[in-house]
Amino acid sequence: MSKTNKLYKETSPYLLQHSENPVDWHPWTEQSLKKARTMNKPILLSIGYSACHWCHVMAHESFESDAIADVMNKHFFNIKVDREERPDIDQIYQIAHQIITQRPGGWPLTMFLDPKNNQPFF
């Protein structure tokens, strides 16, 4: 059996596509956010959707790499969000991206969040 991360029980096709990545992905849940706070690790938030071409490219080039996953797992609490399942979360961080960069966002969207308040930092 393949090694899986915390996404293997999800119903979203997009999240399930990432359930066997070496990245230790977690879904966006209160339990996951609480664990990130307890561990005091910054959150690496990745938002995308199953029909997104560039999301698949990023997954193949980054999230399937053991070397990149090792760095992500060591330094971050990794959370993956399907924008089609959680448009509320997507909207919050797309707006935050636009405010921070003065440019519209897109997908995949990667943000670094403070685990204490889920606010982006850069």
Task: Describe the predicted segments one by one.
Residues 1-122:
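Replace the tail clause
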